[in-house]
């Protein structure tokens, strides 16, 4: 299977969200990546349920919703109701992670677990069978436009080995600082999904940039 590209709307022009959605619809992108931040788990506040409900009216591709919030289990049904197809929670923010992943799946969504850069992939082992997607942060979460942490490669290789050994088809997603400079090596290490924000939306031709990432 070819790798997937998920442009992150955190880096988009919020004053022209409908146009940004139409651009992604017409591109080679596979998913929309939506970062929800609460100003508590991460030091920033982005957008939430009402904005995603609006975005969903203009999208033709799956919504990959990444919750950077405390107590994510409180909002599972709310995000399902506004169109989330994949719902990812942070291992660092979930007290009862196994229960939360089961609840996400019961609502018909794919269940994802995100890891901050300092979190060891071995912590995923108890819930790996319940996890459809692992979102590996390659920057410290909270702000777009940060530099890629190159230690991510080793973590991807280790996680891929765990997935293969367990006989699972869990996808590995890389989120943070992704550009064409890092994409090929990430894919070779085992990444399945590349989230790209500033690299796409700040480029002169976002559609072409997405296409180039897809062809790598």
Question: Where on the chain are the PLM-derived regions?
Answer:
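Predominantly soluble domains enriched in secretory-pathway, periplasmic, or organellar proteins
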Residues: 101-103, 119
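Conserved beta-strand segments that form the floor/walls of ligand-binding pockets within enzyme
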Residues: 4, 114, 135-138, 173, ...
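Active-site/ligand-binding-proximal alpha/beta "capping" segment
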Residues: 140, 147-193
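Conserved N-terminal beta1-alpha1 strand-loop-helix module at the mouth
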Residues: 1-88, 93-96, 103-106, 111, ...
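Short acidic loop-to-helix transition motifs that present clustered carboxylates
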Residues: 118-120, 179
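Short, acidic/turn-prone active-site loops that include or flank metal/cofactor-
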Residues: 92-94, 116-118, 139-142, 198-201
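Short beta-strand segments at enzyme active-site cores
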Residues: 32-35, 172-174, 196
């Amino acid at each position: 299977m070819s790798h997937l590209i998920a442009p992150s709307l955190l880096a988009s022009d919020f004053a022209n969200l409908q146009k940004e959605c139409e651009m992604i619809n017409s591109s080679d992108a596979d998913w929309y990546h939506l970062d929800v931040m609460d100003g508590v788990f991460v030091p920033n506040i982005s957008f939430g349920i009402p904005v995603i409900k609006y975005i969903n009216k203009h999208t033709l591709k799956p919504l990959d919703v990444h919750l950077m919030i405390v107590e994510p289990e409180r909002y599972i049904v709310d995000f399902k109701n506004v169109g989330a197809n994949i719902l990812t929670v942070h291992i660092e923010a979930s007290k009862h992670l196994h229960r939360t992943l089961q609840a996400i799946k019961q609502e018909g969504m794919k269940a994802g677990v995100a890891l901050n850069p300092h979190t060891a992939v071995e912590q995923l082992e108890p819930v790996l069978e319940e996890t459809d997607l692992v979102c590996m942060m390659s920057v410290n979460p909270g702000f777009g436009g940060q530099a890629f942490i190159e230690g991510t490669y080793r973590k991807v290789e280790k996680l891929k080995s765990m997935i293969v050994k367990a006989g699972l088809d869990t996808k590995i997603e890389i989120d943070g600082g992704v550009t064409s400079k890092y994409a090929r090596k990430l894919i070779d290490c085992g990444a399945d999904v590349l989230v790209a924000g500033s690299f796409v939306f700040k480029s002169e031709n976002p559609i072409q940039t997405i296409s180039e990432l897809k062809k790598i």
